[in-house]
UniProtKB/Swiss-Prot annotation:
Subunit composition and interactions: Homodimer, forms a heterotetramer with a Cas1 homodimer.
Name recorded for this polypeptide: CRISPR-associated endoribonuclease Cas2 1
EC number(s) on file: 3.1.-.-
Pfam families tied to this protein: CRISPR_Cas2 (PF09827)
Cofactor: Mg(2+)
BP GO annotations: defense response to virus; maintenance of CRISPR repeat elements
Length: 102
């Protein structure tokens, strides 16, 4: 992968298959802090490089590498995500940029 400015937000789809219900709940609660729930075990997120790394690190600490699976699909620059998404059925709403309170 090429070098990416860490402050440039990208749109991600994060999908996971977690074998243990307790770990699944921990992953779900973590993901609520990083993105918008789309459907069972699927979130959409707008993340800069630092938040992507932080999210991946937390998820890595929660999952069992032998039985669980987390996919982070980079859809590209967040401002252009509408061009890359096709939705069937219920309308897909892209995640708008929101102010972050630190």
């Amino acid at each position: 992968m090429g070098t990416r400015r860490s402050n440039a937000e990208h749109a991600y789809v994060v999908a996971y298959d977690i074998a243990d219900p307790k770990r699944w709940r921990q992953v779900f609660k973590t993901m609520k802090g990083y993105g918008q729930w789309v459907q069972l075990s699927v979130f959409q997120c707008r993340l800069d490089g630092g938040r992507r790394i932080a999210m991946a690190s937390i998820l890595e600490s929660l999952i069992d590498r032998e039985t669980d699976h987390v996919l982070m699909l980079d859809l590209g620059p967040a401002e252009d995500v509408d061009l890359a998404v096709e939705s069937l059925g219920k309308a897909f709403e892209t995640l708008e940029r929101q102010a972050m309170i630190i």
